Curated annotation (Swiss-Prot):
Enzyme Commission (EC) number: 1.10.3.2
Keywords: Copper, Disulfide bond, Glycoprotein, Lignin degradation, Metal-binding, Oxidoreductase, Repeat, Secreted, Signal
Gene: lcc1
Name of this chain's protein: Laccase-1
Record InterPro entries: Cu-oxidase-like_N, Cu-oxidase_2nd, Cu-oxidase_C, Cu-oxidase_fam, Cu_oxidase_CS, Cu_oxidase_Cu_BS, Cupredoxin
Residue ranges of domain Plastocyanin-like in the record: 68-185, 191-337, 396-525
Conditions for induction: Not induced by resveratrol or tannins.
Binding site for Cu cation 1: H119, H448
Keyword presence, DNA damage: no
Organism of provenance: Botryotinia fuckeliana (Noble rot fungus)
Positions annotated with a glycan in the UniProt record: N71, N87, N114, N226, N284, N327, N391, N398
Length: 561
């Protein structure tokens, strides 16, 4: 790894702070028919930017979402700073679809000095690996000025997010909500949508990378709730309003760089009905532990006394620090409350500092599916020299030579540092991959697998051994689960989705330091799943990236993800 990257980024950070970036350009972000006039009881002739007067023989609406990646100065907590964002907002525009829809998102990179790529977190991408959005694995980065149209099928439903998977970009604001509508395991009256919890700084996250790589991770400054907060008397709190007696669905997501949260609402309990994209048997709670990239759907009944209540994102201090941890809050106001002042409520929740997941016994999938564990792959996580390593190898990708390109060229040999594990469905493994991860003392690690939900067979203290008990009866399944400090995590997933799939720690520093591997799944079946048009798109994106890289001011100096 080269030190030039750190010095270049530091210069970039200081320049960005010294000179204001352009203000946000407002870009349409929803489906066209939702952008202009709505088709309502009194405007039935209207259809977005079209109407009953439109000649349908010559004009057909183009549906999809349009996202623009850009540098702008924003004041999320009252302090102006350079950010990266989609369409001028943090979080970016919500992408909404129904279960079974085909989703089309056009992403344009208006950054002048960096590439980008967008990952649709938790989307299965069945037979669709080319649109998973990981540079160096499923695509080349989108070069400045370029546009890539992502296409995927909503095979699963629930709550998630989309974000940049290029270096540390999402930590500077490059993320947004992704909601796939579908059934729920409990009833409610109002869907309040996504509630984002994230850490935040007043300098670009990139400028902290040098410290994160060479020593202890930096202490982060503050945090945001749905893209807003206060700092030293400036800014504003996130607020939402309840009507007494109604039930509200809230989709909580942790999009932090290095922060684990305990979410609660003073004076309220709630039902938990989903984890990640998996509906669960509802259970009652007064708080939930939310690791990085995890999502929980909760239903809150407005049954407290009319008034104002704090919404809290409690910082989990065992894994990282935050200077203003106690200030990551929002406000719940009841209809009928005459006060607009800050709440005076206190929390009765027992504070947790563990950085662990919700108890496994609480996380019962609503649709029971039993995994198979006939053969187990073992991997050990270690650290040293500013890197994290799986079985002694730290991930290091080449953005111009993604894994999928080798597959498209009928190859099956990758550099050692690509950390490739080939997997195939066989009679011996009965179509299941089982991975036992053992880790050292130190921080917990939220492990995310692309292309699959996985079943958690065991999670606990101590390294995995042949005597470790495995749960094979409807264990929790999701796409992010925590590897405990000095402990183990045993996961299983079905070998049913040809592609190259990244597995990594979702602490951004650790991902950049190489804490990742990839599964090349059913290699001979990957190419047949990619149509000719998609192969052409893939190749054109790589050609544009290769043409731009000779002028790239910031050479790659992290793992690539």
């Amino acid at each position: 790894m080269k030190n030039s990257f750190f010095s270049s980024l530091a210069k970039f950070a200081s320049l960005s702070l010294a000179f204001a970036l352009p203000t946000a350009e407002v870009i349409p972000s929803a489906l066209e028919e939702r952008q202009s006039c709505a088709n309502t009881a009194t405007t039935r002739s209207c259809w977005g930017q079209y109407s009953a007067s439109t000649n349908s023989y010559t004009t057909v609406p183009k549906t999809g979402y349009w996202l623009v990646v850009q540098n702008t100065t924003l004041s999320a907590d009252g302090v102006s700073r350079p950010t990266l964002n989609f369409n001028g907002t943090i979080p970016g525009p919500q992408i909404t679809a129904d279960w079974g829809d085909d989703v089309i998102v056009h992403v344009t990179n208006k950054l002048t000095s960096n590439g980008t790529s967008i990952h649709w977190h938790g989307i299965r991408q069945l037979n669709n690996a080319q649109y998973d959005g990981v540079p160096g694995i499923t695509q080349c980065p989108i070069a400045p000025g370029g546009t890539l149209t992502y296409k995927f099928h909503a095979d699963n439903y629930g709550s998630s997010w989309y974000h940049s998977h290029f270096i540390l970009q999402y930590g500077d604001g490059l993320f947004g909500p992704l909601v796939i509508n579908g059934p729920a395991t409990a009833n409610y009256d109002v869907d309040l949508g996504m509630l984002f919890l994230n850490d935040w700084n007043h300098v670009p996250v990139q400028s902290l990378w040098d410290k994160a790589k060479t020593g202890a991770p930096p202490t982060l400054l503050t945090g945001l709730m749905n893209g807003t907060n206060t700092y030293n008397g400036a800014g504003k709190k996130f607020q939402t309003t309840f009507t007494p007696g109604l039930k509200y669905r809230i989709r909580v997501v942790n999009t932090a760089v290095d922060g684990h949260f305990q979410f609660s609402i003073d004076g309220h309990s709630f039902q938990v009905i989903a984890m990640d994209f998996v509906p669960i048997v509802p259970y009652n709670a007064t708080s939930i532990l939310v690791s990085i990239a995890q999502r929980y759907d909760i239903i809150v009944t407005a049954n407290a006394a009319v008034g104002n209540y704090w919404i809290r994102a409690g910082w989990q201090t065992a894994c990282s620090g935050n200077t203003n941890a106690a200030n990551i809050t929002g406000i719940l106001r009841y209809t009928g409350s005459s006060s607009t002042a800050d709440p005076t409520t206190t929390s009765t929740v027992t504070a947790s500092t563990s950085c662990l997941d919700e108890p496994l016994a609480s996380l019962v999938p609503f649709v029971p599916i039993n995994p198979v564990a006939s053969s187990i792959m073992k991997t050990t996580l270690t650290t040293g020299g500013g890197q994290w390593l799986f079985n002694g190898s730290s991930l290091l990708l080449n953005w111009t030579d993604p894994t999928l390109l080798t597959v498209l060229n009928s190859g099956n040999i990758w550099p050692t540092e690509y950390n490739v594990i080939p997997i195939e469905s066989t009679t011996a493994n009965k179509g299941w991959a089982v991975l036992a991860i053992s880790g050292p003392n130190g921080p917990n690690h939220p492990i995310h697998l692309h292309g699959h939900d996985f079943w958690t067979l065991s999670q606990g203290t101590g390294a995995y051994t042949a005597t470790t008990a495995l749960n094979l009866v409807n264990p929790p399944r999701r796409d992010v689960m925590t590897l405990p400090t000095g402990g183990h995590l045993v996961i299983a997933f079905q070998i049913d989705n040809p592609g190259s799939w990244l597995m990594h720690c979702h602490i951004a520093w650790h991902a950049s330091e190489g804490l990742a591997l990839q599964f090349v799944e059913s290699e001979s079946s990957i190419l047949p799943t990619i149509g000719t048009a998609d192969v052409s798109t893939f190749q054109n994106t790589c050609a544009a990236w290769k043409a731009w890289t000779p002028t790239e001011p910031f050479p790659q100096d992290d793992s690539g993800i």
